[in-house]
Amino acid sequence: MTTVNQLVRNARPTKTFKSNVPALGACPQKRGVCVRVYTTTPKKPNSALRKVCRVRLTNGLEVTSYIGGEGHNLQEHASILIRGGRVKDLPGVRYHVVRGALDCAGVHSRKKSRSKYGTKQPKS
């Protein structure tokens, strides 16, 4: 255990924080342009074709972003908004596309958790 004199001479080092979403800087979301839209397969033991896109952000960085929900309208050169949030079974995917913002349409015929998928309230 350290003494008071030792702490006065040499203070304890502060722990450095490492961001999980470095491309966003300190921003909650960032705008970008789709460079490539494609599907990829997840790690074992899962099996699917996950929809992802390569995005060039306004700060010049290029990241891979996941497109959540059933179906999407994204093509190359589409302007999209991305947020942080990794996909556990896709290595290297640390960002999500915000559905219902800019060129990305919301999920059609979504009834529950609509706000997460950019779906308007259905006409009753």
From Swiss-Prot:
UniProt-recorded Gene Ontology molecular function terms: rRNA binding; structural constituent of ribosome; tRNA binding
Keywords: Methylation, Ribonucleoprotein, Ribosomal protein, RNA-binding, rRNA-binding, tRNA-binding
Gene3D superfamilies given in the database record: Nucleic acid-binding proteins
Subunit structure as annotated in this protein's UniProt entry: Part of the 30S ribosomal subunit. Contacts proteins S8 and S17. May interact with IF1 in the 30S initiation complex.
Keyword Nucleotide-binding assigned: no
Protein function: With S4 and S5 plays an important role in translational accuracy.
GO annotations of cellular component type: small ribosomal subunit
UniProt entry tagged with the keyword Ribosomal protein: yes
Species this protein is from: Blochmanniella pennsylvanica (strain BPEN)
HAMAP family registered for this protein in UniProt: Ribosomal_uS12_B
NCBIfam families: rpsL_bact (TIGR00981)
Any one GO biological process: translation
Modified residues (3-methylthioaspartic acid): 89
UniProt name for this protein: Small ribosomal subunit protein uS12
Highest taxon of source: Bacteria
Protein family (similarity comment): Belongs to the universal ribosomal protein uS12 family.
